[in-house]
């Protein structure tokens, strides 16, 4: 089924972007110099935004609409489509700007968390934690 293959190709690109974001995050926590944090926040925000835009592309919704309920799908493919639909529906509820802001905040809060842990002073992280909680509730 061509629509299913098209969807898989789009999802592969989204997954690759997620893997790149994970590598950037890992590097930030393990090896990156502290002074590089603002640039890393920008990089992570960009990759999060681009990934979100691809996932919420109306073409993904069109492909899902075309594929859902197809008699041609195997059981595993049908399960995959249900999961993709759930991800698509959730993602489309979040504005891209919000996703970008979350990525920037998450990256910057790693810096304050690391400093708070090193100094044993968790008040350093309090404001970032508060913002994280507010974003999670939004």
Task: Give the residues covered by each predicted segment.
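A well-structured
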Residues: 1-138
